[in-house]
UniProtKB/Swiss-Prot annotation:
ATP binds at G169, D170, R171, Q172, T173, G174, K175, T176. This is ATP synthase subunit alpha. Belongs to the ATPase alpha/beta chains family. PROSITE patterns: ATPASE_ALPHA_BETA (PS00152). It comes from the Bacteria. The gene is atpA. It catalyses: ATP + H2O + 4 H(+)(in) = ADP + phosphate + 5 H(+)(out). GO terms for cellular component: plasma membrane; proton-transporting ATP synthase complex. Gene3D superfamilies: 2.40.30.20, ATP synthase alpha/beta chain, C-terminal domain (1.20.150.20), P-loop containing nucleotide triphosphate hydrolases (3.40.50.300). Produces ATP from ADP in the presence of a proton gradient across the membrane. The alpha chain is a regulatory subunit. It is found in: Cell membrane. One of its GO terms (molecular function) is ATP binding. It is an enzyme of class 7 (translocase). Its EC number is 7.1.2.2.
Amino acid sequence: MNVKPEEITSIIKSQIEKYEKKIETVDSGTIIQIGDGIARVYGLNGCMAGELLEFPNDVYAMALNLEQDNVGCVLLGSQEGIKEGNTVKRTGKVVEVPVGENIIGRVVNSLGHPIDGKGAISTTETRAVELVAPGVITRQAVKQPLQTGIKAIDAMIPIGRGQRELIIGDRQTGKTAIAMDTIINQKGKDVICIYVAIGQKQSTVAHIVNNLIETNAMDYTIVVSAAASESAPLQYIAPYAGCSMGEYFMNKGKDVLIVYDDLSKHAVAYRAMSLLLRRPPGREAYPGDVFYLHSRLLERAAKLSDKLGGGSLTALPIIETLAGDVTAYIPTNVISITDGQIFLETELFYSGQRPAINAGISVSRVGGNAQIKAMKQVAGTLRIDLAQYRELASFAQFGSDLDKESKRTLEKGKRLTEILKQPQYKPMAVEKQVMILFAASRNYIMDIPVERISEFEEEFLDYMDTHHREIGDEIKEKQVISDELSDKLRNAIEEFKKIFLIEG
């Protein structure tokens, strides 16, 4: 076989012509210490705060401490198989989560990966976990109601779209139950709900998801779960990830409700991370920026101006207190950040008052502007009536003789307290709330025995549905009780009472 030199020359020439020099520069560093989900890396000189770093075994980390000679970062995955001396690369990106319509109805972890066994989520858009809150000019006042379906809240502590309302109380007082009822009540109201579970037991999250599926609420809900078994960094970013998912819809002009359950565990996870990163501890061993941790999260809840689509993000953060102590560090921080709080009490819970809301110290600072006029008309005196009742009830314990007026106040208070009781997973439409509170506040239930109040309520609402549906429809449509409607409602109550008392 003859090989011509010219052929070899032409092949070499063509190879030289096609040769492309590819130089890829990667800013990399070396792990000098790793343990407890924290790594210290030497050599990442250009690293940004909050940047995503690539570790071996496809594990990523988030840079938090930028020190003179090393970078302190938290691992967003398992540290198994990673050791000192391994190489770490910069990605040049910050931590992002997938966002979009396809996440609705799914259960995801803090990084937006599905954990419900229903396969991958097909979405191309991502959004940074940490983003700056909307500015003053881009917002508008809270003026549209977000109905919870819970009589005590919608009447006395109304919540508006774009508000931050804290749910605070000891463990096992029904905090999550209020949040769940609020989510269930958004059915058909075109509100997207996000439930963020931070440091919860996996069995608890599974129970919540099952309830949402049974009540068909999962059709418009996203569940973000960072269970108690997850590492502190994943628990730390969970609420920010949920918030970014919600902001995507808010920026499209939609209304979003987000529940953070709960921020006490979130602060504990952040404290663990901070102490491992050797940041100086402050009060209750929390780091100095624990206020900023929650304020930058809750400030992202807003009602956007009409120019930006008028979308809203309403936040319901939950805080767990110890023995009712609201003066602890985290509770006082979050109370000062939010626009009001719903305070739940153990004593009320065990005395059968459920939801166990203490109306005396629960408040909504901006929700009053969002409350519908019909509710204002019937619930205006409710808080004062209950306050007078509580004051008299504690006085009456001593067995002193009471005058007629005081006895009447006590009797009315007992009935109002009974009316405000409500079973779980049974949120009530606002027009029904208005009708029953109209009967209660206008003294139409004074001759009904206390033990028959719940029976009266149920049968009265059934009666109104069957015989006077137009009254409920008018309240729903016009959101105000005119003199004419008031007379119709009075007559309907009188009619029903005759039947009820005869049957009784």
